Amino acid sequence: MQKLQIFVYIYLFVLIVAGPVDLNENSEQKEYVEKEGLCNACLWRQNNKSSRLEAIKIQILSKLRLETAPNISKDAIRQLLPKAPPLRELIDQYDVQRDDSSDGSLEDDDYHATTETVITMPTESDLLAEVEEKPKCCFFKFSSKIQYNKVVKAQLWIYLRPVKTPTTVFVQILRLIKPMKDGTRYTGIRSLKLDMNPGTGIWQSIDVKTVLQNWLKQPESNLGIEIKALDENGHNLAVTFPEPGEEGLNPFLEVKVTDTPKRSRRDFGLDCDEHSTESRCCRYPLTVDFEAFGWDWIIAPKRYKANYCSGECEFVFLQKYPHTHLVHQANPRGSAGPCCTPTKMSPINMLYFNGKEQIIYGKIPGMVVDRCGCS
């Protein structure tokens, strides 16, 4: 009994010397750990975001088959950018980004961009065709995007200078050919008559699909065209070689090629915001700003929602591949852990200058993360 009393006295002495026990110590440590964990998650997401931005730059150049970003200044763009209706409509009504992730489909697309519309500006011919000893507009070179795709539409756009009085204008599009025995150097493509009212000039489009298809089959026959738009006094109103103040009024070709859609399959995933405390694999918002990159050669969109994936992929979270969970349970050391990656990607439409100062309107696959999952 005396030994027990001594033990109790010693125990009480230790408590007094050690001081009172802080009952909140464990909760504070737990709170610190939780905050530290959240900070680590934020840092991990920031690293994923930075990596995604750098990957997007590389992907865009690669998918557009560009070794480097075209070096085109803003001043040059103002000079080269046509002021024509089809291009203005593309810019004004541009569908910057669809975020229809609710459809839950996984797109199987090709790696490289699928071109929908190519706007080609006139250039100088390697074999300069001349009529009456004067070079005539216009000669067009065609990229592989046009050469190796099915052309569904080809329009020649020309700008007619304004008139002071109501005038009837006779428009002729002539195709240059090799000299014939009788000296003929051209053959007609299309003729039309227009009634113009005084005031502003107008843009006129002309169907040249048949001619373009012939040029693609026989490239040596492409010697260029001559454009005439004569008023009643014989003055040519067509802008072929723009004068000062007529920048952006050059003739150009608008060519549309086919785009074959592909089938898709179903998939689902989590959506989060930057303030989310979700630890599982999730899709987070990310806006790409091309102006911040200094990429003035991209006409539209100037920015788009790309999104990125981040989060943990524990085996218990796996729903897409349940067999993976069973494999891990059978051999936990021999099976690699899953990663948080995109499971649904969608394309963006882009209007841009290529390395040859041609304006391209195309679809770039796999640029938007619509779903994230563990795989």
UniProtKB/Swiss-Prot annotation:
Q: Name one GO biological process term.
A: positive regulation of macrophage chemotaxis
Pfam families, per this entry?
TGF_beta, TGFb_propeptide
**Which is an annotated GO molecular function term of this record?**
heparin binding
> Could you tell me which PROSITE patterns the record lists for this protein?
TGF_BETA_1, TGF_BETA_2
Provide the residue ranges of the propeptide in this protein.
19-266
List cystine links. Answer: 272-282, 281-340, 309-372, 313-374
Show which residues constitute the signal peptide.
1-18
Q: Tell me the subunit arrangement.
A: Homodimer; disulfide-linked. Interacts with WFIKKN2, leading to inhibit its activity. Interacts with FSTL3.
Q: What is this protein called?
A: Growth/differentiation factor 8
Please name the source species.
Answer: Aepyceros melampus
